[in-house]
Structures are given as C-alpha cells and as structure tokens.
C-alpha cells in the first residue's frame, strides 16, 4: 500500500483540523459547534472521536449567514 494523501474535496469525512483548513473556520468554533450539536446530521462519531461529513456540512454552512 502506497502512502499518499487524499485531497480534502474527495474525502467523505474530515477531522476537526482538516475541516478547519477546508472551510476556513477556526478549530475552536468547530469544536463549539460539535459540543452544542452532538447529534447533528453532519457528524460521525467513532467512539469519542468526531468526524465531519464534508458534503452535509457544506449544505449546513450554505444555510447560514454568519457562523
């Protein structure tokens, strides 16, 4: 298996750090969104580790005028 990086735009889920870079939203703001909305449809939990479903979060952000 070769070691290569998948571009963010092709990933199904993003870590908090990756999502912060991709959406240009601070990690603190993303962590606050996660803690305030732990059952949001754009979140995927693996134990206590959260992943952000990129396309669903894009749709969520599209509905906002400010974050």
Indicate residue ranges for each PLM-predicted region.
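Intrinsically disordered, low-complexity segments enriched in glycine/proline and serine/threonine
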Residues: 8, 54, 58-61
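Short intrinsically disordered terminal tails
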Residues: 1-3, 63-67
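Major-groove DNA-recognition helix of helix-turn-helix-type DNA-binding domains
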Residues: 22-51, 58, 65
């Amino acid at each position: 298996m070769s070691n290569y990086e998948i571009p963010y735009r092709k990933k199904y889920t993003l870590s908090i750090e990756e999502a912060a870079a991709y959406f240009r939203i601070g990690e603190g703001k993303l962590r606050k969104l996660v803690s305030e909305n732990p059952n949001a449809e754009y979140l995927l939990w693996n134990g206590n580790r959260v992943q952000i479903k990129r396309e669903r979060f894009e749709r969520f952000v599209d509905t906002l005028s400010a974050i």
